[in-house]
Amino acid sequence: MGEEVVQALVVDNGSGNVKAGVAGDDAPRSVFPSIVGRPKNPGIMVGMEEKDAFVGDEAQTKRGILTLKYPIEHGIVTNWDDMEKIWHHTFYNELRAAPEEHPVLLTEAPLNPKGNRERMTQIMFESFNVPAMYVAIQAVLSLYSSGRTTGIVLDSGDGVSHTVPIYEGYALPHAIMRLDLAGRDLTEYLMKILHERGYGFSTSAEKEIVRDIKEKLCYIALNFDEEMKTSEQSSDIEKSYELPDGNIITVGNERFRCPEALFQPSFLGKEAAGIHTTTFNSIKKCDVDIRKDLYGNIVLSGGTTMYEGTGERLTRDITTLAPSTMKIKVVAPPERKYSVWIGGSILSSLSTFQQMWITKEEYDESGPSIVHRKCF
């Protein structure tokens, strides 16, 4: 490669959405659902070209006649054939870039199994012939995008939540906590409590409607019990939502009962600790000398931290748990839905990062296990 730096492609593979674009941009060019849809009844789709699978938005718009599958569950790839379809769609249809001409930066969940990183590496070099690639931990990228190298990231997306303490740019694996409770669980919980109100949402297509209701109307109460009392006495918190068929439904205390499950997982029948306790426990697992830096830099990341009131409530609940002299600061960047991608864009355009790429030569020499030596 000459002196001219070829732009890298940055792909953040989330359980819910793929965020993809070009290094150096300040936002992803393409955001689409991580879905592969296949016809329920092959052969009866009149006027549609015989495609065996649809990816992303196209799968979303034809969802009535398709079975939708998410190849990434709880942040980790479980179906590699579908994942390859998603990557193919990302490069050729969304970014319209030839992967063999660009280095590719991919993201992974914290504590991603070793075999998974190797598989990602193998597919990039062997199926897509990339010249170079790198796999970065999602939470670390979010921290970079907030302009920090030390802090604790609470990253909550569609499939999984993690608290990841990071010191001088390195994640501390022994203190990472994983919570299998995220956006998809909240969508399912909202379906359930709307059912109790008499609104029956059940199909995979209707689930997408409920996800939209959740994103538009839900918020986090500063004090849940008070909010419940208030909602019983007045109808101020009721909001209406228009369904695709024109019917209008009313959503009341479901608006804050749904995301409350982040703080009280028992609502979902889970025994886990809430996000406030998980963050606190993660910090407690770190060396006593760095805790002050972590408490003062709690950085939110991911779509499930976007509810109004998240930052305030987290500050209040962690302050209650932490030593009384400790200064607690929760940082909620406005672009946190995309902060993993933005961090990847920043990292892969740094001149100092250019020697970090795994090159095709290195891969050919060492095989997929090279990823453990070069990406950490």
UniProtKB/Swiss-Prot annotation:
Regulation: ATP hydrolysis occurs in the polymeric state. Unlike for mammalian actin, ATP hydrolysis also occurs in the monomeric form and the release of inorganic phosphate (Pi) is more efficient.
Subcellular compartments: Cytoplasm; Nucleus; Cytoplasm, Cytoskeleton
Catalytic activity from the UniProt record: ATP + H2O = ADP + phosphate + H(+)
GO terms (BP aspect): symbiont-mediated actin polymerization-dependent cell-to-cell migration in host
Enzyme class: hydrolase
PROSITE patterns: ACTINS_1 (PS00406), ACTINS_2 (PS00432), ACTINS_ACT_LIKE (PS01132)
Gene Ontology MF annotations: ATP binding; hydrolase activity; structural constituent of cytoskeleton
Gene3D superfamilies: 3.30.420.40, Actin, Chain A, domain 4
Keywords tagged on the record: ATP-binding, Cytoplasm, Cytoskeleton, Hydrolase, Nucleotide-binding, Nucleus
Pfam families, A to Z: Actin
Main localization (coarse): cytoplasm
Coiled coil region boundaries: none
Stretches the record annotates as DNAseI-binding D loop: 40-61
GO cellular component terms, A-Z: actin filament; cytoplasm; nucleus
EC number: 3.6.4.-
Protein transport in keyword set: no
Top-level taxon of the source organism: Eukaryota
Binding-site residues, ATP: S15, G16, N17, K19, D158, G159, V160, K214, E215, G303
Remaining remarks: A potassium ion appears to reside in the active site during hydrolysis and leaves together with the inorganic phosphate Pi. K(+) does not activate Pi release; however, it may be relevant for ATP hydrolysis.
Subunit structure: Monomer (G-actin). Oligomer (F-actin). Polymerization of globular actin (G-actin) leads to a structural filament (F-actin) in the form of a two-stranded helix. Unlike for mammalian monomeric actin, parasite monomeric actin is able to induce oligomerization in the presence of ATP or ADP. Mg(2+), which is used to coordinate ATP, is required for polymerization. Interacts with MyoA. Interacts with DNase I with low affinity.
Family: Belongs to the actin family.
Function per UniProt: Actin is a highly conserved protein that polymerizes to produce filaments that form cross-linked networks in the cytoplasm. Polymerizes into shorter and less stable actin filaments compared to ACT2/actin-2; this is thought to facilitate gliding motility and host cell invasion. Has ATPase activity. ATP hydrolysis leads to the formation of a stable intermediate ADP-inorganic phosphate (Pi) actin, which is followed by the release of Pi. ATP hydrolysis affects filament stability; ADP-bound actin depolymerizes much faster than ATP- or ADP-Pi-bound actin.
Protein name from the UniProt record: Actin-1
Organism: Plasmodium falciparum (isolate NF54)
Lineage, uppermost ranks: Eukaryota, Sar, Alveolata, Apicomplexa, Aconoidasida
